Regions:
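Charged, compositionally biased N-terminal leader segments and the immediate start
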Residues: 1-22
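A short N-terminal interaction module
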Residues: 15-61
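AMP-dependent adenylate-forming
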Residues: 23-24, 28-30, 92-120
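Conserved AMP-binding/adenylate-forming core of the ANL superfamily
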Residues: 38-41, 103, 107-161, 178-183
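A short N-terminal helical cap/helix-turn-helix that marks the beginning
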Residues: 41-43, 51-65, 82-107
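Structured binding elements
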Residues: 167
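Active-site charged/polar residues at nucleotide-handling catalytic sites that mediate phosphoryl
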Residues: 189-190
Length: 192
């Protein structure tokens, strides 16, 4: 990647940092000369770009897609990965099972009082699977909308991933919304 200095930018990476960056790794994997060529080729052939990005990011599918995108209804109505089936839990947790990453921290947390904790991929997986089974035992399943109203603690990641694991839809809620907007969101989303 060619280093092009811009005088009005406060911080610029070193050439070494650029050479080892994820964008440079992507440029190399895409088989293009530099960032400008990547942009040009992506603009000319979005299907090539997104297929390349999905492979580079190692996004897994239970069922491979037939076509990466369909823009026939217009750019604002693009359909992605037609025929494919995937799940966020597959890509955040499951694909790392039986790898060195499995025992590494997925979440680091520090309370306002300064207490620190972490959850490894494996520990998070156990909690996600337990909660997913609990949700299923309550009769919740694929396609159901489930409101998630929790503070930013590690358990919110457990709940979010458990909801997604069963194929349900998360309706994220925030205490700053107030009661009436929360009721509207739950009703509009047909939350169970």
């Amino acid at each position: 990647m060619e280093f092009k200095p811009y005088p009005d930018i406060v911080w610029q990476p070193t050439k070494e940092l650029l050479a080892n960056s994820q964008i440079q790794k992507f440029i190399n994997a895409a088989g293009v000369a530099d960032y400008d060529e990547l942009l040009t080729k992506a603009d000319q052939d979005p299907e090539w770009f997104w297929n390349t990005a999905i492979k580079f990011l190692d996004i897994k599918f239970y069922q491979p897609y037939d076509k990466v995108l369909d823009q026939s209804k217009g750019i604002e109505w693009v359909e992605w990965c037609l025929g494919g089936k995937t799940n966020l839990v597959l890509n955040c947790l499951d694909k790392h099972r039986d790898t060195a990453i499995w025992s590494k921290p997925f979440i680091h947390h520090e309370t306002e009082a300064g207490k620190k904790s972490s959850l490894s991929y494996a520990e998070l997986d156990v909690k996600v699977c337990q909660l997913a089974e609990g949700l299923r035992s309550l009769g919740l399943s694929k396609g159901d909308a489930i409101g998630l109203y929790m503070p930013m603690i590690p358990e919110v990641a457990v709940a979010f991933l458990a909801i997604i694991k069963i194929g349900a839809v998360v309706i994220p809620l925030f205490s700053g919304f107030g009661p009436d907007p929360i009721i509207v969101r739950l009703n509009d989303g047909k939350a169970k």
